[in-house]
Design a protein with these regions (language model features):
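Intrinsically disordered, low-complexity, mixed-charge
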Residues: 1-103, 111-223
Length: 223
């Protein structure tokens, strides 16, 4: 995919033959790429991405709950990873489709062929951070994210041309936090539309879901 993005016509044709879905949905996949990466040279020094939302959600856990956490839960491989998978998959499903979100999830997890063959080494099985258990948990979280994304898309009537206001984004993310609250039996500090992260990500959503090629061309011309 990276070779196709940065390479020539032959690289792009090769991806089209190997993965027609990628070629057909190239535009939407590119928009997801921008939402999932911090692009400071295009969106400014304070650019934010999916991961920043997950990180903030982990910070939103009520401080009284932290004493109950296992040390690993407070790490990047703990709740942040869980929130990142579910929240990103929910947003991708809401913005685009469950099919696209599922495709991206499968491509990400299939970096390990052992997940399909089931032939794991003992070292892989014992590796809780990067082994099969981690991947399978991610896959389950991806599915829950997609279900949340479908429900929230209907609740807020979100369409491709929907303008993402800070209020809409805060409400959307608070609904996801309510799901975490019910599932994990933990209290969360709600997002506010005045939060800087909410303002920045809602702005980015509107750019990415709008005339993205025009924005990118203009941003790169100013470098």
């Amino acid at each position: 995919f990276r070779r196709a993005r940065d390479g020539g016509l032959l690289d792009k044709a090769n991806v089209a033959m190997l993965s027609p879905y990628t070629a057909i949905n190239r535009d939407e996949l590119m928009r997801v790429f921008y939402l999932s990466r911090r692009r400071h040279h295009q969106f400014g020094a304070s650019d934010v991405a999916f991961y920043d939302l997950a990180e903030r959600m982990a910070c939103n856990i009520n401080e009284n709950e932290f004493s109950k956490l296992y040390p690993r839960d407070a790490t990047e491989k703990g709740f942040i990873n869980t929130f990142n998978h579910i929240t990103a998959q929910a947003l991708m499903t809401t913005l685009f489709s469950e099919e696209l979100a599922d495709f991206i999830a499968d491509v990400h997890e299939r970096l390990r062929p052992e997940l399909i063959t089931g032939k794991f080494s003992k070292e892989q099985i014992d590796d809780l951070d990067e082994g099969p258990l981690d991947n399978y948990v991610d896959m389950i979280n991806n599915e829950w994210g997609q279900e949340l994304g479908k429900k929230l898309k209907l609740k807020y009537g979100i369409e491709p041309g929907t303008k993402w206001t800070p209020e809409l984004l805060a409400n959307y993310l608070n609904d996801i936090q309510k799901y975490y609250q019910q599932s994990l039996k933990m209290e969360f500090i709600p997002f506010r539309q005045e939060d800087y992260l909410i303002i920045r990500f809602s702005e980015k959503l509107n750019i990415v879901m709008g005339d993205l090629p025009k924005f990118v061309k203009k941003a790169e011309a100013q470098l």
